[in-house]
Regions:
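Short acidic-glycine-tyrosine-enriched beta hairpin
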Residues: 40-42, 52-53, 81-101
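Extracytoplasmic
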Residues: 42, 47, 67, 116-118
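A short beta-loop-beta micro-motif enriched in histidine and acidic residues
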Residues: 55-68
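Surface-exposed patches in mature extracellular/periplasmic domains of secreted proteins
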Residues: 59-62, 83, 105-107
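Glycine- and acidic-residue-biased ligand/ion/polar-headgroup-sensing regions
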Residues: 65-83, 92
Length: 127
């Protein structure tokens, strides 16, 4: 676990350094940076950093990936990935299984006036 967190931290720093001098059109609300790393063997790692306030839920979507890890760097977020809503805060994370359709839920709890800073990591086939 320490190894995974160390790699995640290094990727976060590398993403911040790389994205500081690149201006890209944001494709997702709150997207700060988005990078893709070639892992070899036909696989790639997608690393995104998102910052939002008072977002509520996101539009319905899914990720065609082997799975997605969402790590809360700061603030509060929530997920229903376990089957029921759960709040996550600083240094907590959740896993979203492959092709899990989520977002747009009408039963999402109101988190109130909160912000979140998230690191999203997913591994997918190249292309």
């Amino acid at each position: 676990m320490k190894y995974f967190l160390s790699i995640s931290f290094l990727l976060l720093i590398a993403t911040d350094l790389y994205s500081d001098d690149h201006s890209e059109e944001q494709s997702f609300p709150g997207m700060v940076s988005s990078d893709v790393f070639d892992m070899g063997g036909g696989m790639e790692m997608h690393v995104e950093r998102r910052k939002t306030c008072n977002q509520g839920t996101v539009p319905k979507h899914f990720h065609p990936a082997a799975g997605t890890l969402v790590y809360v760097l700061d603030g509060v977020s929530q997920s229903k990935s376990s089957g029921k809503w759960k709040k996550y805060s600083n240094n907590e994370y959740w896993f979203e299984k492959s092709d899990w359709v989520h977002g747009g839920e009408t039963d999402a709890p109101d988190l109130g006036d909160v912000c979140s800073d998230l690191l999203v990591i997913r591994v997918a086939e190249s292309g």
